[in-house]
Swiss-Prot record:
The gene is rpmB. It comes from Mesomycoplasma hyopneumoniae (strain 232) (Mycoplasma hyopneumoniae). It comes from the Bacteria. SUPFAM superfamilies: L28p-like (SSF143800). InterPro entries: Bacterial_rp_bL28 (IPR050096), Ribosomal_bL28 (IPR026569), Ribosomal_bL28/bL31-like_sf (IPR034704), Ribosomal_bL28_bact-type (IPR001383), Ribosomal_bL28_sf (IPR037147). One of its GO terms (biological process) is translation. This is Large ribosomal subunit protein bL28. The keyword Ribonucleoprotein applies. It holds the Pfam family Ribosomal_L28. Keywords: Ribonucleoprotein, Ribosomal protein.
Length: 64
């Protein structure tokens, strides 16, 4: 599961680089992946790779 958010399942997006002459070359917009540790209801710790946006939402909901 490389370059994928393990909670929201979002992956990289594709687009173009644009020079001053407006030439277009393909590029990839990768997610800002972070590693977090969550506790399950049984007290077991699990490590997940999530995007910074997902981490921010989890912190807001009080899960991190």
């Amino acid at each position: 599961m490389a370059r994928k958010d393990q909670i929201s399942h979002r992956g990289p997006l594709s687009g173009n680089n644009r020079s001053h002459a407006l030439n277009a070359t393909k590029r990839k917009f990768n997610l800002n992946l972070q590693q977090i540790t969550l506790k399950t209801a049984s007290g077991k710790k699990i490590r997940l790779k999530v995007s910074a946006k997902t981490k921010k939402i989890l912190r807001k909901w009080g899960h991190v």
